[in-house]
Structures are given as C-alpha cells and as structure tokens.
Amino acid sequence: MSPDPRKPTKAQRQADARTRARAMREQRERAERRRRAGLVTAAALAAVAVVSVVVVAILAGGDDEVPQAVPASFSESGGFTVGDPGAPVAVSIYQDYQCPFCAQFEAANTDFLEERREAGDVAVTYYPLDLLRRLGDYSERSASAAVCVAEEAPEQFPAFNDALFANQPQEGAGGLTDQQVAALAAEAGVPDEVESCITSGRYTDWVTQVTDARDERVEGTPTVLVDDEVVPADQFQAAVDAALAGAPTS
C-alpha cells in the first residue's frame, strides 16, 4: 500500500519539532531579557531615589549652616569698625549687650574712645556676641539690632551702642522687647525704616554663628584687644596710650 501523501514523514516531524523547540527557546530568552531589563531599571530608579534623598538632606542641612542674612559692612570674623581704618592704633571689643561687665566697660571708656577716635588715633572694631544665650534670647536680639543699625545707619551706631548699655536690663531677666529696642534706636537718631530689621531679628542666626566661630582668645565678655593683644579691661586706657606713644608718626 502506498503511503498517505497528507501524512508528514518522519523527517518532517523532526524538523517541525526542532522549529517549535527553537521558537520556545527564543520566547524564553526574550522573557529573560525583559526580566533582566526590568531589574536594571528598578535598580536605576532606586539609585536615583537615594541620590535625591541625599541631595535633599544636604540642602536641608545647609539651611542650618548658612545664616539667612549676612551683613555686608561687617568683616568675616564679625566685626564692625568705627573710625579711620588706617588709624595708628586698632582696638577690638567683643561684647554682649546682656553682660553687666560690658556695660561697666562701656561707661568707663566711651568718652575716652570717642576722643581718640575723633582725633584719628584709634579705630574701634565692635563684635556683638550672644555668649549669654543660655540666659535667654536678649543677647542675640540686641546684637542683631546693633547689626541692623550698623548696616543701615552706621553714623548712629556709637549712640545706639551706648543706649543699649545705658538701658541694659537685669542679666537673665528676659530683656527689653524688640519694640523697646527699636524705640532706643529711634532716640539715637536711627531712621524709622530700620525698625523692621530690628523687630524681625534679621541677623540673629548670623550673630550666633559669629559667636560660635569667634577668636579662641575670647572666653568671656568683655574681651578687649589693643593692636591684636588682649589687655585687661582695667588697663585698657593705659594700653591705648602706650600704643599711641609707640606708634610711628606720619
């Protein structure tokens, strides 16, 4: 009997089997490639997410390290100079407006400094600090107010500096309100437009950072330097006069 031509031969069946096997193998390989691609994509997305979190954390941390406002008229170390910067004698005063010894130093030496400054003999650099922050926020608020005045009404800074010490509240008693400090500024001739800087505490963060990064020789207030040498407060005037006597004449 002759074979049925519609029935595939053994060779044809083997070829069909190989074709189906190859197709199944290629399908499995495509599925495996898709699976691996998915894993790579997921890993990449996870890495991006981690980087994003790190960047956000760094930026958030940076907000704590960079003060919101930085005064342009102060040095990098936090000092504001009154008088001729080229004067033969340089005086630096590190002070806290809540410090009673600073108020005593100011009362004893304000006239002396004014005379020497106006004569062109002395340049005075003031460093408003908040070393007594543990007693409340008045140190930083008053120091910030002093920075506001130095920035926006520098000619009135000496008078406002005197007024803050002359009206110094009892140490640790809470201090003057921002409105009372602004009123002292107005009495010292500071323009009204400076009030918002004072009452907003614009430079409090900056004051705290300057205090924390202060000269290592400043262990308390007042700390007074004459030509970069620390001198006892009760020997200050003698130290200035000695420096003037030894200064070269022009």
Show which residues each predicted segment covers:
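C-terminal cap of thioredoxin/glutaredoxin-like
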Residues: S2-L39, A43-V51, I58, A183-S250
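Hydrophobic/basic alpha-helical segments enriched in Actinobacteria
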Residues: L45, V55, D84-A87, V91, ...
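C-terminal region of N-terminal signal peptides and the immediate post-cleavage residues
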Residues: S52-S73
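A short beta-strand-turn-helix
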Residues: P71-V89
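Structural alpha/beta surface segment adjacent to cysteine/selenocysteine redox centers
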Residues: A87, Q95-Y97, A103-D178, A186
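Processing junctions and N-termini across compartments
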Residues: I93-D96, V218
